[in-house]
């Protein structure tokens, strides 16, 4: 009888371990735009006009701003001559491939994932 009880307890423990192993993990929450900006953009760009300029211009209030026109930043010739204002569509194209928007620009960053670009653009809009 003792062996039967011990065997039953062992079986219950093993079955519960198998059930635990088959439980799905909760879905990971994708990073938000602020986190993605810090990870992928903040090396070159600030979000504050009072901070020193970095390799790229500050991006605070970029949505609606005329491209290539932050005072004190030295833009490439192509970007300095740009005649458009930044909007969601233009920012999405820019983050996908800056060279396709304005050939000859210095920015090397490219983001292939639409959801990552959308999160970064949403964050930039919040800075307006």
Where are these regions (language model features)?
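C-terminal segment of classical bacterial N-terminal signal peptides
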Residues: 12-20
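Detector for the c-type heme attachment site
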Residues: 45-51, 64
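Short Fe-S-cluster ligation motifs
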Residues: 69-89
């Amino acid at each position: 009888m003792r062996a039967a009880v011990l065997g039953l307890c062992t079986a219950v423990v093993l079955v519960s371990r198998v059930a635990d192993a088959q439980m799905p993990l909760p879905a990971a929450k994708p990073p938000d735009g602020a986190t993605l900006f810090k990870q992928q953009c903040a090396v070159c760009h600030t979000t504050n006009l009072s901070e020193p300029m970095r390799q790229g211009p500050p991006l605070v209030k970029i949505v609606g701003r005329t491209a290539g026109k932050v005072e004190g930043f030295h833009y490439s010739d192509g970007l300095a001559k740009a005649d458009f204002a930044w909007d969601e569509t233009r920012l999405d194209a820019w983050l996908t491939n800056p060279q396709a928007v304005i050939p000859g620009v210095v920015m090397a960053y490219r983001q292939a994932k639409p959801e990552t670009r959308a999160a970064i653009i949403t964050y930039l809009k919040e800075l307006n």
